[in-house]
A protein has these predicted regions:
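A structure-centric signal for secondary-structure junctions around beta-strands
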Residues: 81, 137, 217-218
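C-terminal cap of thioredoxin/glutaredoxin-like
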Residues: 2-52, 180-248
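Short hydrophobic/aromatic segments of transmembrane alpha-helices and their interfaces
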Residues: 75-77, 173, 182-183
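Extracytoplasmic low-complexity, Pro/Thr/Ser/Ala/Gly-rich segments
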Residues: 46-113, 121, 245-248
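Stable alpha-helical elements in mature extracytoplasmic
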Residues: 102, 136-140, 151-155, 172-176, ...
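Amphipathic alpha-helical segments within well-ordered protein domains
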Residues: 141-142, 160, 177-181, 191
């Protein structure tokens, strides 16, 4: 996590000292806030700025079905002995790398009952594009979950396969609808939800809650509540399988 350069020059006299106290007080508050969430997630604050020509996030918003109270989508048996939680932003390149390395591990674990997986999709990377792709994709995550979770992991895999490069326009809503339909989400209500950004407000509320809980990077992965920090487990092919097996 990045940090700010430390230290300010000492005041030269009492008058300058008083001026510095006035000027530095709000700066210190800002620095403390930045240190608390990490420089990477400060981008989220700027991302709240309205981007001309795109939809604007609504306050509040509807609550989708098939989600936990904290907004995560749980896939797998309710009594699974192992619970894996993945916090992700669908525009995050490291999240794509994690999915490529361990997506099948998680699908297999759900299929054979070894583990349940809770996917917590957040948005803080709208600044990485020009059309608020991060939040549009996050909204789509709740649109498909609201319709059912049976195809959710396949949908996630397809979303990361089609993840756009940072800095561009991202995928249009029509492409998000196509990906959903390819994963089996053919109900016209899903397409309408994606176009209307029906869960945009809900997504942003849950994002705030996740960030306030102490998450400061994506992907953040936990197994039975213990954060996985080993890079090999996160990014090596099938690396998470060993961690899941050890937690059984």
């Amino acid at each position: 996590m990045s940090t700010y350069p430390g230290g300010w020059p000492p005041p030269q006299n009492q008058q300058s000292n008083r001026r510095l106290l006035v000027v530095l007080a709000p700066i210190v508050v800002l620095l403390v806030a930045a240190a608390a969430i990490g420089i990477g997630l400060l981008a989220r604050n700027a991302a709240a700025e309205e981007i001309p020509g795109t939809a604007t996030a609504a306050a509040g918003g509807s609550t989708p079905a098939n989600v936990l109270a904290d907004g995560a989508v749980r896939v797998g048996e309710s009594d699974a002995k192992v619970t894996v939680r993945v916090v992700m932003d669908l525009q995050c390149p490291a999240c794509k790398a994690f999915e490529e390395a361990n997506g099948k591990v998680l699908e297999d674990a759900v299929r054979d009952g070894t583990a349940a997986v809770e996917y917590s999709v957040i948005t803080f990377l709208d600044r990485a594009g020009t059309t608020e792709y991060s939040s549009r994709a996050g909204n789509a995550a709740f649109c498909v979950a609201n319709s059912g979770v049976d195809g959710y992991q396949a949908w996630l895999s397809d979303m990361f396969t089609e993840q756009p490069a940072e800095g561009g326009a991202g995928l249009p809503d029509s492409a998000l609808i196509d990906i959903a339909e390819s994963a089996g989400y053919t109900d016209p209500a899903v397409a309408q939800c994606i176009t209307d950004r029906a869960y945009d407000g809900y997504l942003r509320t849950k994002t705030d809650e996740v960030l306030n809980s102490g998450v400061n990077s994506t992907p953040t992965v936990t197994v039975n509540g213990e954060q996985v920090t080993d890079a090999a487990a996160l990014m090596s092919p099938n690396g998470l399988a060993v961690v899941i097996a050890a937690a059984r």
